[in-house]
Amino acid sequence: MSEYRQATDAFASNPVESKQEIRNYTMNFGPQHPAAHGVLRLILEMDGETVVRADPHIGLLHRGTEKLAESKPFNQSVPYMDRLDYVSMMCNEHAYVRAIESLMGIEAPERAQYIRTMFDEITRIKNHLMWVGSNALDLGAMAVMLYAFREREELMDVYEAVSGARMHAAYYRPGGVYRDLPDRMPKYKESRWHKGGALTKLNAAREGSMLDFLENFTDTFPSRVDEYETLLTENRIWKQRTVDVGIISPDLARAWGMTGPMLRGSGIEWDLRKKQPYAKYDAVDFDVPVGTNGDCYDRYLVRVAEMRESNRIIKQCVKWLKANPGPVMVTNFKVAPPSREGMKDDMEALIHHFKLFSEGYCVPAGETYCAVEAPKGEFGCYLMSDGANKPFRVHLRAPGFAHLSSMDAVVRGYLLADVVAMIGTYDLVFGEVDR
């Protein structure tokens, strides 16, 4: 008798003993998945299509930013901050330069504070435009990305006009900002894509200064947000994919240290711009949107409302900046570099500039923690100085790290398709998570 026949007879005589164990299966989500938003590797334990456990793996974008910052003079590490959350660049810079200013006991001029406030909100709109477009794309609504990037491109031009870079601006400096706002905006040149009446229309808002351009932008932007909401807010498929998906209770949000839209979407009104004002947030009028249910849909509504509030803040800052010219850097020349004009005919100014940017300056011994309300949540910088020209310790508090830690607790019991919606609503960028 063959071995096959023997095994068949054994199973027929006692099927209970031959019963095989049925186990959950493990699935790798990312790091190459297009909805992973970077290098997220999520190991999912699945029972059919239901998530039983989620294990996020991080570190694939670790670059040792904190240790790099500790090896360089204080003022040389500002560009590193841009490369953490590389969608919210200037907000990262703001936390770092505030920490240096706190240790040195200096304060940026009032005009520089208004410029920082304005660019923090420009950055918030840029972040949320990227988020609403990419999150909608993840869930199958491609058109929203095209609409959102139309306005985001205009704000990228503002970044480029003021700093020379579309993304990594390095515009904030300890003691102020790199330079005052430019008197003109760059214009589109004729090309195969821009020509004729369309080119004239595009350049119509770029005839004046940057503040004129931003004033025009703030007038038109609310109607653009209305267009995004027309596409999504009452869209039946969008609501089916987001309502009652990824519910985070207020207690769970507090327990996991959530901040920003993740916390406010659960109904907790916590915003550093209101609770611990910095820059000129105590001088502008705005509201803090909060959700009620704590699901993906509420977090979407919170971010859309935040874009409208950021637009209000920018409009107020533009009005003040137009009426109040002034310095944008402190007069403490231990921190402030000489002017470009001065360096052209003054050797002492050239030496001063060289020493300032090659050796930096010594910061009094001490420690401080400064945080800003970044688009994704509380971005904080703990800075310790031993009196040298380099930090003794730099620690960065990234909101995405705390949010990602809660992934397992939030996604359990949902379907695999819902995981994509939840990852999108977390608004993760792994430059800040891995650091």
Swiss-Prot record:
Membrane topology per record: Peripheral membrane protein
Catalysis performed (reactions): a quinone + NADH + 5 H(+)(in) = a quinol + NAD(+) + 4 H(+)(out)
GO molecular function ontology, one term from the record: NAD binding
A family per Pfam: Complex1_49kDa
EC class: translocase
Highest taxon of source: Bacteria
Cellular component terms per the entry's GO annotation: plasma membrane
Residues forming coiled coils: none
Subcellular location: Cell inner membrane
InterPro entries reported in the protein's UniProt record: NADH_Q_OxRdtase_suD, NADH_UbQ_OxRdtase_49kDa_CS, NDH1_su_D/H, NiFe-Hase_large
Family membership noted in the UniProt record: Belongs to the complex I 49 kDa subunit family.
Oligomeric and partner information: NDH-1 is composed of 14 different subunits. Subunits NuoB, C, D, E, F, and G constitute the peripheral sector of the complex.
Reported function: NDH-1 shuttles electrons from NADH, via FMN and iron-sulfur (Fe-S) centers, to quinones in the respiratory chain. The immediate electron acceptor for the enzyme in this species is believed to be ubiquinone. Couples the redox reaction to proton translocation (for every two electrons transferred, four hydrogen ions are translocated across the cytoplasmic membrane), and thus conserves the redox energy in a proton gradient.
Protein name: NADH-quinone oxidoreductase subunit D
